[in-house]
Amino acid sequence: MKAPVRVAVTGAAGQIGYALLFRIASGEMLGKDQPVILQLLELSNEKAQAALKGVMMELEDCAFPLLAGMVGTDDAEVAFKDIDVALLVGARPRGPGMERKDLLLENAKIFTAQGAALNKVAKRDVKVLVVGNPANTNAYIAMESAPDLNPKNFTAMLRLDHNRALSQLSLKLGKPVGGIEKLVVWGNHSPTMYPDYRFATSDGASIGDAINDQEWNAGTFIPTVGKRGAAIIEARGLSSAASAANAAIDHVRDWVLGSNGKWVTMGVPSDGSYGIPEGVIFGFPVTTENGQYTLVKDLPIDDFSQKYIDKTLAELEEERSGVSHLLG
């Protein structure tokens, strides 16, 4: 049996946490031969800690052979001690009448503290996925607050946008989603992100040629993917939790176990590619192998695409400048 991998999950008793933990414990994220120890962080209030205890009781009651241990805590340094993987799910949701900039600042406090705790106690090669919104900027804050860790350890989740775009293409084409490759989602995990199927194929055939409808692309596809989260809230009365958890599992699984040459979208610190300033956490196409990701380089960017990339970058730059004073 392999040595257990330590996985931290923040916001562990929340909706996404609840949809995530049982799948991690069953081996869906790191492999069916990989034991895990779950290190679960929740808010210190009585209600959150009681809910966390209940989730841990349920995890016990599943008798997962791969679940080698659990820790439940309200202390980030306990939750992040010696961890291999961190899923930072917990974030301050936007309350009624709350300005976006206030939300940014509230979350900046959380992710500054969590970045510092990771810096202090996590393994040096820890893989960090930020799910809590605004994910790109929260990941940037955590990364900047952990100066002793490699910036490449920090990623933001754009896999939900990627999966949403895959499914819209599958519906449009009437073809199975599993045959679609080389889709890209550029930018911020927000309605400004740009799903781009110019390079995508379905069973090897060009999707751009098959659809060949720029009006559908600009008027239906891009806005449908961008506003999908809001559409789910309207329909369900709650934000997307199971699909977000599923995307987190996809992201970490591919990062750790490899994407087998397939392109996937990850929010990663830019190395200056595609004109994105260095250090900005931006959705890019990557391939993954041996626990490392590699940017897909030198894709041509046409004028239509550049306009969308510029727009999502401008939003990220604005978010970054809104919190920069907190990062020294």
Swiss-Prot record:
One of its GO terms (molecular function) is L-malate dehydrogenase (NAD+) activity. The keyword NAD applies. Gene3D superfamilies: Lactate dehydrogenase/glycoside hydrolase, family 4, C-terminal, NAD(P)-binding Rossmann-like Domain. Substrate binds at R94, R100, N133, R164. Its EC number is 1.1.1.37. GO terms for biological process: malate metabolic process; tricarboxylic acid cycle. It holds the Pfam family Ldh_1_C. The active site is at H189 (proton acceptor). It catalyses: (S)-malate + NAD(+) = oxaloacetate + NADH + H(+). Catalyzes the reversible oxidation of malate to oxaloacetate. Belongs to the LDH/MDH superfamily. MDH type 2 family. PANTHER family: MALATE DEHYDROGENASE. This is Malate dehydrogenase. It comes from Xanthomonas campestris pv. campestris (strain B100). The gene is mdh.
